Amino acid sequence: MHAHWRSDSQRAMRLRALCRKKLGVLACAGYAVAMTDAPASAVPMQYPPASPRIALVFGGSGQIGEPLLHGLLAAGWQVHAYSRTIQPARPGLHWHLGELGTLSMPPLPVDVVFSCGPLDAFADWYQRLPVHAPRVVAFGSTSLEVKRDSLDATERDVARRLREAEATLFALAAARGAAATVLRPTLVYGAGRDRTLSAIAALARRSGWFVLSRSACGLRQPVHVQDLAEAALAVLASATTHGQSYALGGGETLRYRDMVHRVLAVLQPPARLLLLPHAVFALLLALAHACGRLRGMNRAALQRMREDLVFDLAPARRDFGYAPRAFAPDAAMLGVTSGAAVRQ
């Protein structure tokens, strides 16, 4: 009986040694194994955290780029951004001096390239250099459609360059195995640096009133810069957006003159809106041009005030959950202080 016991014991010892040997292989494969008389249990080993994703941003100091940088840093990205002027350093944000026309390859491999500046300049840079980032997100403009048939030749050229830049970007990205998305904002506001609503607020604040044509009843969809920055981040998680362009308007559609009225209402004190017959307004505009003023308000812009510039946001809502805010500006969004307007 003792011989049988010793034989069984020896067999058990050999079996346990064999188990230890084989389980050691499992441990080397990435599992820590507890060797006790109780059943062995495999516990995943602790690996170092994954390296942070790296983004390259052009136009990072602009009105859309700034909130985009905040969003990237908050999400744990390492960001490399270019600017033509020296910018203050921040944790996780690396600034580089330079302009697109003279830049060479990115300083290191990146996961995504964002362009928040002129699309044609970015497309030229992307074409000039063999950049191999798996993801590209660039801002264009709905001017591609709005100014296609403009009365002004310069505006038609803007639309042409936007159209060609989009085509170049999509073609190059596809050839390089990258996924590109183009976002086309409508009328941008929110940082006090736009050339339309903030300019209206500044002019009205100086005079205490603003003159507009009664015919300025075309519909608009003003969009906040924060909503645009969030859209740029949201498309990264949606493969449906690859190779697509999206119009990005605001969450409210309103008449041009109602939009202007809301802008004037945030001033302290509120500025008055003076509505004139179209012919009278056009004459005053011509006189202003003769005096070298209001050059940005040309005949084509006056015509567009009467047109509905409304875009379908359904594709953006469907593909990446785009949900822009309604138009509710305040003084800070328009770049004006809360002090009293200067009456002239």
Language-model segments: what does each one mean?
Residues 199-225, 270-309:
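Alpha-helical membrane-targeting segments
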Residues 157-181:
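Active-site Tyr-X1-5-Lys
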